[in-house]
Amino acid sequence: VEKLDFHDVDYWDELTTLLEWSKTHVFSSFFICWAAQAALYYFYGVSKYLLSHKLTGVYLHHTNVEKMQRKILRGFDYQFYAPHSRYTSVSKEDIEKIDDLDILAESKEAGVYIVASKDGSRFFVTGHPEYDPDTLDKEYKRDLANPDIISEMPKNYYLNDDIHNEIQVKWRSHAYLIFANWLNYYVYQQTPYNLDELKER
């Protein structure tokens, strides 16, 4: 599905119906990986681009220090790790053209990572902070078993980049922070008790 044009995805109409519904029924939305790309395209017209090979592994990121006052970044170190597993990406230049969006974190290798609307109603995360320790391992071994896939070993994941060594879990504290911050500051504290008060955002 990731390599398909959005409009060629079988459930695109159903998905866009939900995205449109969220404008008036959801105070803050959090989109991950392909869903982040799809939502960026639907709400802002940001296209995705096919990479030359699968981006997979655990990559070093840095926060945008000028945006550290954003509550989603509370407790973040200036540098942190996060997993990625995808064949497509979005362009930093395309996002920077949109006044309503802020790039909050990115990676030299993996590109843009956290994008947020200025009002906090939408967050777009291009990686997978939710991944379990062994998720990338399972994906890699699945791909190895498929002769139609050119498998890529996850970078910075196995000790010394050796599949026979233990997995290095470097993203857990970041994962807890990003989800806890979003739920606390943008869902629990700001969603109005009367949902009829939600305005189109």
Say what each PLM segment does.
Residues 2-65:
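Cysteine-nucleophile active-site neighborhood
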Residues 17-20, 56, 60-201:
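Amide-donor transfer/coupling interface in amidating biosynthetic enzymes
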